[in-house]
Swiss-Prot record:
It holds the Pfam family TatA_B_E. This is Sec-independent protein translocase protein TatB. Residues 96-131 are annotated as: Disordered. The Tat system comprises two distinct complexes: a TatABC complex, containing multiple copies of TatA, TatB and TatC subunits, and a separate TatA complex, containing only TatA subunits. Substrates initially bind to the TatABC complex, which probably triggers association of the separate TatA complex to form the active translocon. Part of the twin-arginine translocation (Tat) system that transports large folded proteins containing a characteristic twin-arginine motif in their signal peptide across membranes. Together with TatC, TatB is part of a receptor directly interacting with Tat signal peptides. TatB may form an oligomeric binding site that transiently accommodates folded Tat precursor proteins before their translocation. The keyword Disulfide bond does not apply. Its main location: membrane.
Length: 131
């Protein structure tokens, strides 16, 4: 739950807590929060243990589809399309249809340089209605 918080974020939270709660109430608030998180973790581990006891070996069978679903949720649409419809070959999506021969990388043609903008002499056009 708090795995994505870095030490810098935690320091900012402590400083904000110190400003909002004050130095007298901050240790009690930290203690209360840690106890609440510990109780929630114990409750969730108890629920997991109870499910394991109630379902028995079917619990592990239930975990396999759930882990596959979790993998699919993390995929981008392009990765899902590549994996399931194209069997991992993404050359259709990337445009790299021809494989390089003997491991030699094909060099793309250099991009054409944009034509230089012609220098205009004279007065700059002015539109009184546009300004």
């Amino acid at each position: 739950m708090l795995g994505s918080l870095s030490w810098e974020h935690m320091l900012v939270l402590v400083v904000v807590g110190l400003v909002v709660l004050g130095p007298e109430r901050l240790p009690g608030a930290i203690r209360w929060t840690s106890n609440a998180l510990r109780q929630a973790r114990d409750y969730l581990s108890g629920v997991t243990t109870q499910l394991r006891e109630d379902l028995g070996p079917e619990f592990d069978d239930l975990r396999v589809p759930l882990s596959e679903l979790q993998k699919l949720r993390g995929m981008t649409p392009r990765a899902a399309l590549t994996k399931h419809l194209l069997d991992g070959d993404d050359s259709f999506l990337t445009g790299a249809f021809d494989r390089p021969v003997n491991g030699a990388a094909a060099q793309p043609p250099p991009a054409p340089a944009p034509p230089p903008e012609p220098h205009r002499s004279g007065q700059t056009p002015f539109d009184a209605d546009a300004t």
